[in-house]
Every structure is written in C-alpha cells, then in structure tokens.
Curated annotation (Swiss-Prot):
HAMAP family: 16SrRNA_methyltr_C (MF_01862)
The keyword Aminoacyl-tRNA synthetase is annotated on this UniProt entry: no
Family annotation (Pfam families): MTS, MTS_N
Family according to the record: Belongs to the methyltransferase superfamily. RsmC family.
Organism from which the protein derives: Shewanella baltica (strain OS185)
Catalysed reactions listed for this entry: guanosine(1207) in 16S rRNA + S-adenosyl-L-methionine = N(2)-methylguanosine(1207) in 16S rRNA + S-adenosyl-L-homocysteine + H(+)
InterPro entries given in the database record: DNA_methylase_N6_adenine_CS, Mtase_sm_N, rRNA_ssu_MeTfrase_C, RsmC/RlmG, SAM-dependent_MTases_sf, Small_mtfrase_dom
Enzyme Commission no: 2.1.1.172
GN (gene name): rsmC
Name of the protein: Ribosomal RNA small subunit methyltransferase C
Enzyme class: transferase
Length: 347
C-alpha cells in the first residue's frame, strides 16, 4: 500500500523513464521499488529508521537503500549524480532547505527535482522555499490531498557540509553547563523543556550500562555523562538528524557514548542497568500510544535486576495506566502541571 504522496508520484512517473533516480526522505512504503517499472535505477535515503527497515528487504542491483542524514561514502567534490531527485516534503519544515541542498548536490545540470507533500504539511509554501539555484517550482499535480511540484537545477549549489546546518548553544542544566549541537529538523527550544528539566532535576544515581531512549540532540545524554562520566551510555533514536545531532553534542562536550538507530528497542540487545527517557509520546495519537505501549513492555524485559527505569510523560495522557500494568508498583517521583516523572527499580 502506497501513502498518498507516493500515489501522486506514481501518477506522474512517466517523466522518470530510464532515469537514474534518488528518493530523499521517503515514507514507510515501497514507492522506490515501484518506480523500477519505469526508472533505470533507484537509490533511496530514509531519514526515519522505521521507513528504512520497511524498504531495505527489497534492495537489489537496481534499488539501493540507505539510512542517515546523507548518502554514505560521498566525495564532497564528486558526489554521485542523478537525472531526477524526488524529495518528500518533511514534517519538520526547517529540514526542507537541507533536503533541497542535498538534492542539488546530487543532480546533473538541468536535472529534474520533484517535491511531493500533503497539503496540510507546509508544501504550499514550496515556491518561496526553493533556493535560487532551482528554477521556479511549477505545480504538476493536485490529488490525494497532496501537491506535486517540479523544478530543475539551473545554478550551482553550495557544497553539502553538515556544519552549515548546525546551531550550537550553551544549556544550563542541574548537572551544569553543556554545549548542544542542534541540526535542522530536530526538536529544540534552546532551553530545557519542562519535561527534560523535571527529569534532570531528579536524576537517579546510575551505574553500568544505561540506555537513553529517544535521545534527540543529546541533552539528556550530555547531562548524564556530565554528572556520571563513568557510565556506559547507549543513545538510540529513529531519526537520522537526531542521531547526528547527538553525536555532535557528545563530541562538543568531550564525551563518548554508543549512538545508533533503533525502531523502538528492536535494535538494542541485552539488559540495561538503567533506562532513562523523555520519550516523544506527547501527542496522544493512537499510533503514538501504541509505540509507547511497546516501549514500556520491551523496556521492562530489558531491565537488569536492581536496574532503574525513569521516564517523564505527559500527565494528561493515559501512560500511567500502561506503565502501572507493566511494572505494577512504581513511584511518581515528581510532577508539574504538564508532566509526571515515573520511577521503577527492578527488585
């Protein structure tokens, strides 16, 4: 089953006949595989690890699948070139210029750019957002509550450098000053959000192997290592830009941790002495509640004897019931008008 944006691309796939195609920021469907009906070859870069895992089993000699903030093994001066680059307009609008720059660095001169997105997702402003090295965006289709725009590479784009897309700032935490590196598209308020502040203000003493689930830009990870530098810390997230941000944050603070993608806890192994998180479960959608349920269930299985589990969660959502069902007795260590801090120790 194709998502609505992917269906719109299929409606317009004739322009891809025998093209070498790059798909950026694709969704959890098999659109890149379907394009092989007309395209000569397709490379697909997912920025969401779940989307990558959905497509990766279908890779073959004509379909290469990647996860990350960039294609791997690229010479900055000699990037691989494509006849067409398809960009799925990102949910995090600040990520759009990054994707356009990446697309331009991979297009042949006058190569075709296609941008697709849902009407409610910000794509209506595409013409204003396209950099000057692209021709004016033209609306090609309007269907399935989505828009498809086309353009072509007319000028020379700046070379792709990750450092151009980072904002770095100092953050005061209960553990002290830390330096945060935030890439475009990663959540940041340039101050401690209320949930993270609540968690860090009541940080337990940990030891051994600790997991930071949904690490984002690495705020919790850096604060943890600032207070307890001997921890063997692992940081997981589903988002490529978040993982790259976390790595940059740790490096900026002279810290080390194992940073890697995981769909929920599926890619983690073994048991942890501590699991700490301000998980991205604050919107109350059914799909998000399901992810929260899986996280709670799976993390309970991966907690060592005497291990500590502490997460902050939106007090207005039913996560306390989910947590209580899995852990039984647990403490609400602290709360404010928006969040509760849950604590459990595996006895």
């Amino acid at each position: 089953m194709l998502t609505n944006p992917s269906q719109v691309i299929i409606r317009n796939q004739d322009s891809l006949s025998q093209h070498k195609v790059l798909v950026l920021n694709h969704e959890a469907d098999l659109l890149p595989k379907a394009l092989l009906d007309v395209a000569a070859s397709v490379d697909a870069l997912a920025l969401d690890y779940h989307h990558y895992l959905h497509l990766a089993p279908h890779a073959n000699s004509k379909l290469r699948c990647y996860f990350g903030h960039d294609l791997p093994h690229q010479d900055p001066l000699e990037r691989e070139k494509y006849d067409t680059v398809i960009v799925y307009f990102p949910k995090a609008k600040p990520l759009a210029p990054y994707l356009f720059n990446l697309a331009a660095n991979h297009l042949v001169p006058n190569g075709q750019l296609l941008v697709v997105g849902e009407n409610k997702g910000g794509i209506k402003s595409l013409v204003k957002l396209l950099p000057e090295y692209f021709a004016t965006g033209m609306k090609l289709d309007n269907a399935r509550h989505c828009l498809l725009f086309g353009s072509s590479l007319e000028g020379s784009a700046p070379a792709m450098k990750l450092s151009d897309w980072v904002s770095q700032y100092q953050l005061t935490t209960p553990q002290g000053e830390i330096s945060i590196c935030n890439l475009v598209g990663v959540f940041s308020e340039k101050r401690l959000d209320l949930g993270t502040e609540l968690l860090l203000s009541h940080l337990p003493t940990l030891s051994g192997r600790v997991l930071d689930f949904g690490c984002g830009a690495g705020v919790i990870a850096a604060a943890l290592l600032k207070a307890q530098p001997s921890l063997s810390l692992e940081c997981v997230d589903i988002n490529a830009m978040a993982l790259a941000s976390c790595e940059l944050t740790l490096a900026a603070n002279g810290m080390t941790a194992k940073v890697y993608p995981s769909d929920g806890l599926a890619q983690t192994t073994g048991k942890f002495n501590g699991i700490i998180s301000n998980p991205p479960f604050h919107d109350g959608l059914a799909s998000t509640t399901s992810i929260a349920q899986n996280f709670v269930t799976d993390s309970a299985k991966q907690l060592q004897h005497n291990g500590i589990w502490q997460i902050v969660a939106n007090r207005h959502l039913p996560y306390s019931d989910i947590i209580a069902a899995e852990f039984g007795q647990l403490k609400v260590v602290a709360d404010n008008n928006k969040y509760k801090l849950y604590y459990f120790q595996h006895k």
